[in-house]
Swiss-Prot record:
Protein's name in the database: Phenylalanine--tRNA ligase alpha subunit
Protein residues bound to Mg(2+): 256
GO molecular function: ATP binding; catalytic activity, acting on a protein; magnesium ion binding; phenylalanine-tRNA ligase activity; transferase activity; tRNA binding
Co-factor remark: Binds 2 magnesium ions per tetramer.
4Fe-4S recorded as keyword: no
Listed PROSITE patterns: AA_TRNA_LIGASE_II (PS50862)
Subunit structure: Tetramer of two alpha and two beta subunits.
Record flagged with keyword Ligase: yes
SUPFAM superfamilies per the UniProt record, alphabetical: Class II aaRS and biotin synthetases (SSF55681), tRNA-binding arm (SSF46589)
Compartment(s) of residence: Cytoplasm
Amino acid sequence: MKERLHELEREALEKIEQAGDLKALNDVRVAYLGKKGPITEVLRGMGALPPEERPKIGALANEVREAIQKALEAKQTKLEEEEVERKLAAEAIDVTLPGRPVKLGNPHPLTRVIEEIEDLFIGMGYTVAEGPEVETDYYNFEALNLPKGHPARDMQDSFYITEEILLRTHTSPMQARTMEKHRGRGPVKIICPGKVYRRDTDDATHSHQFTQIEGLVVDRNIRMSDLKGTLREFARKLFGEGRDIRFRPSFFPFTEPSVEVDVSCFRCEGHGCSVCKGTGWIEILGAGMVHPNVLEMAGFDSKTYTGFAFGMGPERIAMLKYGIDDIRHFYQNDLRFLQQFLRV
């Protein structure tokens, strides 16, 4: 019996050493230490041995079992370490390779222009007023001297949600709302940036959604000369020193008198080029003195208070400033277009 136990120990230790992976090692464990293994059979056959041999054989069997168990544990630890090393080698990262450059974000050219315009007027003492894009018919039209039946209220020009609610067609409603909050007392000095909506067919110069920045000043003794001085300063800050502006008569229901405002061409210095179409001037915005009806509807005494208003499209200014020929580029999120402005 002793020889049998020693032989089983040698066989088991040899097979443990030969095991190449954890599965093979577990097979050895089951074969020698399992319920049907030879060590278990020896222990079960102890009853057939003479009484004086049982303690010795039992002790030897336990020693053999313990030796095999220790060998199994040592081999398992070794195999697990080798497996970890193989995985590390397979998943190794070559830290000497150059890293992938991080793609940095950059302000959108339109956002850049809007913020630049806001900063210019904030520097002149204006505050920024924002309001709802879904507006009532009253604030979008009627409070701005656009009564029922006015052509600008045509369903073909505006996105109506109900008969009395629509997507705002300009940011002028914020002028009426702000004047109402002042309860007939000046001064009022605001700019109103935001998205507006028109039922236009999208093309190179038109979009159903675009942005506007409108300005309003209301106080005692506001004159046309104040408007011109403000816009001249704006043009010089935005397009460069030496720029001049000119007023051309126009019509807007909410201002009287109304003007179109041109800036001297910043490409040809007024000599005539393709940008200014040979005239030396570029149209940039509309403006005028606030109509007395608009003042009265907002609660201001038009005999005591006067004011001026102006409105511009940041898309047009950005197109002029950066030489962009299609307004749709601003809204297509084409990186080939946007990456041109990384250092603008």
